[in-house]
Amino acid sequence: GFGKTKKYSDGKKVENIEDLFFEFLRVAEDIKPKVIVAENVAGLMMGEAKQYYYKITNEFEKIGYDVSSMVLDSSHYGVPQTRKRVIFIAVREDVTEAVGLTFMNIAGIFPDKFSEAITCGDAFSDLEYDEEEIKMLTEKFSKGSHFETASKMPKDPDKVLTGCDYHPKGHHFNMKRISRHKPAPTITASGGCIHWSEMRKLALCESQRAMSLPDD
């Protein structure tokens, strides 16, 4: 688990953070589990936001945990989506002492990357589509503000394309044309990803596959 730090997604310093971090630490201190696995946005390791990262590690140590962290990308571990998160592994100090764990031993717990990433083409290859949903998505997209920009983006690209590169004023940064040859970019609540060859946003079943969720 972990507290929300949405405002640190891009690594910028923000005052008056609205997150659950201290509540999370309070619960951890009360329960005192042997091991804590926590995650947060990768932006926590960037720029001025890194001050908050150091605060997190210091707080873990204050309540009696040896902690190690690493930025992992879900596309390296069998998920057809690029999603970077900083993962914390904290082990209670009495446990590390009892079994002879060191900081380097804890860091070695993080998994090795898979040899090959799963592409969108691989992940979507056997999907059964709801034709009514596809029709609705296509019609809705054709009437939306992103249609003109999307029409300028090449179809079936070798890599993920970003809308701002095809908008005269650099707008539509969050719109991405996915590539069937690559994992999807990070799926967001705004649903900014569009199909590699069709003029529509991703269908529900495609988004589920990109997030490695079960079809049902």
Describe each region flagged by the PLM.
Residues 1-4, 44-47, 78-81, 96-98, ...:
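Short catalytic/ligand-binding loop motif for oxyanion handling, primarily in non-cytosolic enzymes
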Residues 1-6, 35-41, 88-90, 187, ...:
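Conserved proline-anchored active-site loop of SAM-dependent methyltransferases
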Residues 9-10, 32, 64, 212:
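Glycine-centered helix-boundary capping/hinge motifs
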Residues 16-82, 86-91:
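Conserved Class I SAM-dependent methyltransferase catalytic core
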Residues 59-62, 85-216:
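S-adenosyl-L-methionine-dependent DNA methyltransferase catalytic core
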